[in-house]
Amino acid sequence: MTKRLPAVKTQKGWSPLLKRFTVRNYKNFKNEICLDFSDVAGYQFNLDCIHNGLISKMIIYGRNATGKTNLASAILDISFTLTGEPGLFRGKEIMLNADSAEKTALFRYEFSFGGTEIVYEYAKESRAEIKWEKLSVDGAVIFECDFTCDTYDFSNLEKIGAGTVNTEIYRRSIVPRCDVTRVGEVTVIPFLRWLFSNAVFAQDSAVTALFSYVVNMDIVKTQTAGGSTSQYDRFFKTLENSNNLHELEEFFNAMGIACRLDLKKLPDGQYELYFAHDRKVPFFSTASSGTLALLELYRRIIYSNSSPSLLYMDEFDAFYHYEMSENLVRFLKKRYPKCQIILTTHNTNLMSNRIMRPDCLFILSRCGTLTALCRATERELREGHNLEKMYKAGEFDRYE
């Protein structure tokens, strides 16, 4: 697993944020789809959904099979591109749109780093085969590589402090397609990945900021903790500390699960978590699907004390009661004020100005468009509007 990098800050104290993401010809997204974090309306409520002028908390709705999960893998593609870690990308995968004649999928990431704008874009034929890539900083092209035409422009590397890097070493490392015999072998290492591994950058440089953000991106797919405790032994060992066990107990209670917990080490060295009653009740064999899903979320994200830059939680509340869903949204907003969190759900109870706002609630349509509620109606949406009622009444139907 790729080691997380510490969050990078400018002298103004700003950490890098994703400003805009665009992808085309990827899976069901034949046409260009854009996720614009900078499209902030002027609402003066629930300001904790905004950070440094960009959307930091959003919820995406959409009918089944509109591509909410595909959007997650598209956004996280940069993580594999720049680190080589497979993450959620395992096995042979169909990447290109089945109805398009285009031979590559196009990705574009625009980052805001204090007063600096960083744009990284590339084209891929498959998950591992990159055909073209370009990096720009504040409108100036730093480098551009066309691997199909074998043309390279490294003329502005000095602008990011990499002017002394020997790019000929990189060019000689590129494996010709005819030399590749194993299916799925990477033919070209993206230049930006190679550059970060072979050059030394200042802690506050644009490249360090970009990698810090990418390495700390994460995705959580809906799943329960499963029936076996073996994969949890390391986590359970930390719960031998009574303070850590109490924090987990407090988390469950804050989510609406009234319980007390106990942990025992078994004779075989493994650990067993229990609900503490007059008689101890084994946790894994009796906990509900929602409770197991909460434990998995706690173990993976919350307890690790990681500071994710972007967290995509797909169908995050599939096992939760609507009140627990709302509790978790409030918890995430408070726990991760600077993290850009994207939640997908079918739970319209969260389509509310109590905890969100119209510019942070999106509809992913069957034709591959992503529209904020405030852009999906001619009506001026205000804090007092019942967004869920309007949604069910068909106010936003033409954007579904």
Question: Can you say where each PLM-predicted feature lies in the sequence?
Answer:
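Pre-Walker A-like glycine/lysine-rich segment at the N-terminus of P-loop NTPase domains
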Residues: T2-D77
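Conserved P-loop NTP-binding catalytic core
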Residues: G53-I59, A72-S126
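Conserved Walker B
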Residues: Y26, E315-F319, T348
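Electropositive, glycine-dotted interaction segments
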Residues: K124-I257
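Short alpha-helix of the ABC ATPase nucleotide-binding domain corresponding to the H-loop/switch region
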Residues: H321-E326
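Extended helical coiled-coil dimerization/tether regions that scaffold
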Residues: V8, G13, R24, K221-T286
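Conserved ABC ATPase signature
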Residues: M58-A65, P267-I302, L310, F316-Y320
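C-terminal lobe/lid and adjacent interdomain/linker elements of RecA-like ASCE P-loop ATPase modules
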Residues: L5-K19, S307, N327-E400
